[in-house]
Swiss-Prot record:
Region feature G2, mapped onto this chain: 361-365
Cellular compartments per GO CC: cytoplasm
Residue ranges with Polar residues bias: 140-152
Biased composition (Basic and acidic residues): 128-137
Residues covered by region (G1): 336-343
Residues noted as binding GTP in the record, renumbered to the chain: 336-343, 383-387, 437-440
Family annotation (NCBIfam families): IF-2, small_GTP
Source organism of this protein record: Rickettsia felis (strain ATCC VR-1525 / URRWXCal2)
A GO MF term: GTP binding
The protein, known as: Translation initiation factor IF-2
Signal peptide boundaries: none
Gene assigned in the entry: infB
Length: 829
């Protein structure tokens, strides 16, 4: 049926219903436009949000088009018309009125399309006229341009009048565009249709409606077909291998295979293949050296940057600016022999009494104190123990100090620890001040002490040297002002400066564990400013500074150079003498701590004593002559524990091996008791005690726990234990001599030598040595000793007796017998 045949037999009637397309897909809500290719007049099908009504409106676009645009719009029109047909076919509401309405709409648009050919000539003519007008317009003034606008609107009106829908204007008597829009909205509508509940459409329906229908077959694609198409596209994307990226790989001295693969963004399997090519079998969890890792990375096309493991400590290196330097207080270390008055001198200087609280009158660990003297000038003192066991702690004290004061008792003179203190001070290269103490005592000789100092190259200023020798009395506070003046004078000559800016750094003086407070570490700040909340690394320990306390027990928030403080927050107990630094974050601190722990472990393995071949054979046979004394050492501070361990390991013994199973800071715990029970060890506690649970476990397991408060008592007891484990010395003790005068042969007994005791005493069972012509021909034991017919235990000098030897009868008259006993003596270390 043609376009004219459908319209002419009957006129369109006006009705109350509106033209509607009952499409089931909501995503096409909005306006769909169909463009007449001849006149570019738009016919819009407007669909409400419910998808139930469609209205037609005609809008005039423009008055000049080129032929290319006309052809393109014809194709667009045909494609959209095809979509509408599909929508009608897909809908399950096959209402005849709906199909009829759609046919009417299509016929109207087809009528417009049929007149395209008749207007082509007219369009070409209009294009030529437009070009001529464009040339004329460029030559006219702005006023002439304004006159062109009504002409343009007039042409648009002419275009509208001559549009393909001119038949509709004639049929319905419409004179203007407004009336045409109104007529279409009110008259060209479909009858009302009772709609069912809209069905929820599927993705497949949407693809089918919007799919290309160039073939015109109208075939509906199934959901499985769509899925297959999607999977095919995905496979194409996967098959396209991404371009390989070559990176710069940072390789440390040792790296794991998996870590190397991650650094290169390569598969672990590829890295393992490269290792196999090099003849190395390794899995992802194993480590390889830097050279091998470099070969693998180079073979895979990456560039390599070698770094050393020690580079993690580079963040700790920083230089102070000259303009930031400020004068700081001197750090003075007090050294000397036991009980020569070091702590008493500090008491006098800082007006406190620490010596009274110390066991045995000696300092058990390093203490750091800050003393303010005249003119508000401060001096930091470090009190090192005077006992010989703390030589290592003293050496650490000398490394952090600016000035060393060596205290010598005027009535005692130079002693062993005094010489060690002099040597430590010389090795540190720091100035020395000699304080001759106890000058208040009677019958002292200061000149004798000075002469003893000359022997060790300590020459006073009065003798032309550079060492200040000051006689003092700490008890009577004599000449203390002169000592302070000497300290400040040397400090001024040294021009001691440090920067209070930047990250803090310094040295650990002492550390311990206290119940309820955790790890307590005494540190000395050497540069920068330490604040609460800073993250520090000290040796292999690290943590966040939670609290700072000064030497007077007051809580402070920051510490500047030359200020000693006690901090809380480290995860472990550091060693006395370890350096500390402030780092940016906890990760940096952890990396540095792990690196230092690995170094310490490697060093410990490298210095471990090697067993000789003979010892290995003896151990394998179970006849080892080397005995072991296992010990567990617990102390109050790390420095004391370290000093005890060092002193005990220096005890000389080739037959007893002292093995320290565990040493640490803090009270004795149940785990210590369990370890001691498993290894038959002795637990030694220095200024610490065992808890209730540990004591109960020790009594049950019969573990020996010993407490000490003075270090040399501990060392003496361990030495005695080791001495008791040594094999005793067996020595011959001569007790008498016998002269053989007559030989008797007795049946069932053998030869009996009638003898005379010429010297000492002889005992039954004693050792004998038979001499003939002063040559020893037999050595054995005395089997029989008789006097007349009676068996006796001993015969003294001047008496006769009968003797017989065990398993030996070659005796003659005139032989001499020496009698001796074997005596065991306990050995000492």
């Amino acid at each position: 049926m043609t376009d004219n045949q459908e319209i002419k037999p009957k006129k369109l009637t006006l009705g109350n219903s509106k033209l509607s397309l009952n499409k089931s897909f909501d995503s096409l809500t909005g306006a769909q436009s169909f463009v007449n290719a001849k006149s570019k007049t738009l016919v819009e099908v407007r669909k409400s949000s419910t998808g139930s009504t469609t209205t037609l409106s005609l809008n005039k676009e423009r008055n000049s088009l080129d032929q290319t645009a006309i052809d393109a719009n014809k194709e667009e029109f045909n494609r959209r018309l095809s979509i509408l047909k599909k929508a009608a076919e897909q809908s399950k509401l096959n209402d005849p009125s709906q199909i009829s309405t759609l046919s009417k709409l299509a016929s109207i648009n087809q009528s417009a399309n049929s007149k395209i050919e008749t207007l082509e000539t007219e369009v070409e003519q209009k294009q030529q006229n437009a070009e001529e007008e464009k040339v004329e317009a460029s030559a006219k003034t702005v006023q002439n341009n304004e006159d062109i606008q009504p002409q343009t609107s007039k042409k648009k009106e002419e275009t509208f009048v001559k549009s393909p829908l001119v038949g509709m204007r004639t049929r319905y008597g419409i004179e203007s565009e407004k009336e045409l829009d109104k007529t279409v909205d009110n008259k060209v509508v479909a009858p009302k249709i009772k709609l069912e509940e809209p069905k929820k459409f599927k993705k497949a329906d949407l693809f089918n409606m919007l799919g290309d229908d160039e073939s015109g077959s109208g075939r509906t694609r199934s959901l499985a077909s769509i899925k297959r198409a999607r999977e095919k596209e995905k496979r194409k994307l996967v098959s396209q291998a991404p371009e390989k990226v070559y990176r710069e790989v940072t390789i440390p001295e040792v790296i794991g295979v998996g870590d190397l693969a991650n650094a290169m963004s390569e598969r672990v399997a590829d890295v393992i293949k490269e290792l196999m090519k090099l003849g190395i079998l390794a899995n992802a969890s194993q480590t390889i050296d830097a050279d091998t890792a470099e070969l693998v990375a180079t073979n895979l096309g990456h560039t390599v940057k070698r770094v050393q493991e020690s580079d993690v400590e580079n963040v700790l290196i920083s230089d102070d600016k000259v303009e930031d330097l400020r004068t700081r207080a001197p750090v003075v270390t007090v050294m000397g022999h036991v009980d020569h008055g070091k702590t008493s001198l500090l008491d006098a200087l800082k007006s406190t009494d620490i010596a009274a609280s110390e066991t045995g009158g000696i300092t058990q660990h390093i203490g750091a104190y800050r003393v303010t003297i005249a003119d508000d000038r401060a001096i930091t003192f470090i009190d090192t123990p005077g006992h010989e066991a703390f030589s290592e702690m003293r050496s650490r004290g000398a490394k952090v100090t600016d000035i060393v004061i060596i205290v010598v008792a005027a009535d005692d003179g130079i002693k062993t620890q005094t010489v060690e203190a002099i040597n430590h001070a010389k090795a540190a290269g720091v100035p020395i001040i000699v304080a001759i103490n106890k000058i208040d005592k009677p019958d002292i000789d200061i000149e004798r002490v000075k002469n003893e100092l000359y022997v060790h190259e300590i020459i006073g200023e009065e003798a032309g040297g550079d060492v200040m020798v000051i006689p003092i009395s700490a008890l009577k506070k004599i000449n203390l002002d002169k000592l302070e003046e000497a300290i400040l004078l040397i400090a001024e000559m040294q021009d001691l400066k440090a920067s209070p800016f930047g990250s803090a750094a310094g040295v650990v003086i002492e550390s311990k564990i206290e119940k309820g407070r955790g790890t307590l570490t005494t540190i000395l700040v050497q540069r920068g400013t330490l604040r609460n909340g800073d993250i520090i690394i000290a040796g292999s320990s690290y943590g966040k500074v939670k609290k700072m306390t000064n030497d007077k027990g007051l809580e402070i928030v920051e510490a500047t150079p030359s200020v000693p403080v006690e901090i809380q927050g480290l995860n472990e107990v550091p060693f006395a003498g370890d350096k500390f630094n402030v780092v940016q974050n906890e990760k940096q601190a952890k990396d540095i701590a792990e690196y230092r722990m690995r170094l310490a472990k490697e060093k410990k393995i490298s210095i471990a004593p090697r067993s000789s071949l003979e010892d290995l054979f003896l151990k394998a046979s179970g006849n080892s002559k080397i005995k072991e004394l296992p010990l567990i050492i617990k102390g109050d501070v790390q420095g004391s524990v370290e000093a005890i361990s060092g002193s005990l390991l220096k005890l000389p013994s080739d037959e007893i091996k002292l093995r320290i199973l565990h040493s640490g800071v803090g009270p004795i715990t149940e785990s210590d008791v369990s370890l001691a029970h498993a290894s038959s060890a002795i637990i030694v506690g220095f200024n610490v005690r065992a808890g209730a649970n540990a004591l109960t476990a020790a009594e049950k397991e019969k573990v020996d726990i010993r407490y000490y408060s003075i270090i040399y008592n501990l060392i003496d007891d361990v030495k005695a234990i080791m001495s008791g484990m040594l094999d005793p010395i067996v020595r011959e003790q001569y007790i008498g001599s016998v002269e053989i005068r007559q030989i008797f042969n007795i049946t069932k007994v053998g030869k009996i030598a009638g003898s005379y005791v010429t010297k000492g005493i002889i005992k039954k069972g004693a050792g004998v040595r038979l001499l003939r012509d002063n040559v020893v021909i037999h050595e054995g034991k005395l089997k029989t000793l008789k006097r007349f017919k009676d068996e006796v235990k001993e015969v003294r000098e001047g008496y006769e007796c009968g003797i017989a030897f065990e398993n030996y009868e070659d005796i003659r008259e005139g032989d001499t017998v020496e009698v001796f006993e074997l005596v065991q003596e306990q050995r000492q270390l």
